From Swiss-Prot:
Keywords: Cytoplasm, Methylation, Protein biosynthesis. GO terms for molecular function: translation release factor activity, codon specific. It is found in: Cytoplasm. InterPro entries: PCRF, Pep_chain_release_fac_I, Pep_chain_release_fac_I_sf, PrfB. GO terms for biological process: viral translational frameshifting. This is Peptide chain release factor 2.
Length: 367
């Protein structure tokens, strides 16, 4: 075994241990470990459920604490195992064990980098699940087809990230594609990863719907907002709501269309409209739609406060959701993010959900 190779592995493992130690400090590992023990003790008390609100709050706190403590504990254990394996390979001159150590070090590097990346999630709602609203812009069939391509893109992205994605509502276009759709994304830091996707997405291509092969430009809007749990109070006056039921269309199978199971709720003071047709049960669709409305109202209030703050900071650029953020030019094989200038030439991969470079850059630059 060449000394240079051994030194490289040893140096890599030492660097990983150093970075893991920094993460323990930054994420308050010791404090969170102690607090987790306290919370577990409180939850073991049979009387804890006498106060259900407090018990639920403790349950949420436990989940949050465990996400840090469990992750860093497992990382430390695996780093220790990798170091032991390296020392064994070194002592015995075992090539196969050394190769295994190199593989372990590479996997640990990816894990440490992922935890470091998550330090950029500064929004209080970043750990939450989220909803993605996709709306076709003007342009008829071409715009509706573009909206359906974006729907597929985000479903594939969620699949890559290990998120659960559920299409709650989908309205078909008159000829092809979709007019609009809503996806619920469930997973750790779903909103944190996806929130910078809010904005206008522009497509330029030779249209398959134009027999002359002309070049067309289409727009679709994407709006991402966090799911809000029951611990956050959002007042909704029932008198402010108009609730309509209708027969579902699009995904859902034939049976779903036989009853008025789909639900549309309009919040009249703000004009916010939410729809859900995912379930055969009108009751469950109504509950999901109310959860969506609560999240939309909470997000609207946050954006209102942010807008007021931005007025005081004239150096800030417009971060309103209605601005163009990304351009997809298919015949030139170019997808460019207009905020970060990140560009990719593999348009097929991007449309298949390969958005990591764009999302990483937008989070690092704080767009």
């Amino acid at each position: 075994m060449e000394a240079e190779r051994l030194n490289a592995i040893e140096s890599s493992l030492a660097d990983l241990r150093r970075r893991a130690g920094e993460l323990r400090g930054y994420l308050d590992y010791d404090v969170k470990s102690e607090r987790l023990a306290e919370v577990n003790k409180q939850l073991e008390d049979p009387n804890v459920w006498n106060d259900s609100k407090n018990a639920q709050a403790l349950g949420r706190e436990k989940k949050s604490l465990e996400s840090v403590v469990t992750t860093l504990t497992a990382l430390d254990n695996d780093l220790r195992d990798a170091q032991d394996l390296f020392e064994l390979a070194h002592e015995e001159g075992d090539e196969e064990t050394l190769v295994a150590t190199e593989s372990d070090a590479a996997k640990l590097e990816a894990r440490v980098a992922d935890i470091e990346f998550r330090r950029m999630f500064s929004n209080p709602a970043d750990p939450n699940n989220c909803f993605i609203d996709i709306q076709a812009g003007a342009g008829g069939t071409e715009a509706c087809d573009w909206a359906s391509m974006l729907l597929r893109q985000y479903l594939r992205y969620c699949e890559r990230k290990g998120f659960k994605a559920e299409v709650l509502e989908e309205s078909d276009g008159d000829v092809a594609g979709i007019k609009n759709a809503t996806i619920k994304v469930s997973g750790e830091y779903a909103y944190g990863y996806l929130r910078t996707e809010t904005g206008i997405h522009r497509l330029v291509r030779k249209s398959p719907f134009d027999s002359s092969g002309g070049r067309h430009t289409s727009f679709s809007s994407v709006f991402v907002y966090p799911e809000i749990d029951d611990s956050i109070e959002v007042e909704i006056n029932p008198a402010d709501l108009r609730i309509d039921t209708y027969r579902a269309s699009g995904a859902g199978g034939q049976h779903i269309n036989k009853t008025d199971s789909a639900v549309r709720i309009t919040h009249m003071p703000t004009g916010i409209v939410v729809q859900c047709q995912n379930d055969r049960s009108q009751h469950r669709n109504r509950a999901e739609a109310m959860a969506m409305l609560k999240s939309r109202l909470f997000e609207a209030e946050l954006r209102k406060r942010q807008a007021e703050q931005d007025k005081l900071e004239s150096s800030k650029t417009d971060v309103g959701w209605g601005h163009q953020i990304r351009s997809y030019v298919l015949d030139q094989s170019r997808v460019k993010d207009l905020r970060t200038n990140v560009e990719m030439s593999n348009t097929k991969a991007v449309l298949d959900g390969d958005l990591d470079d764009f999302i990483s850059a937008s989070l690092k630059q704080g767009v």
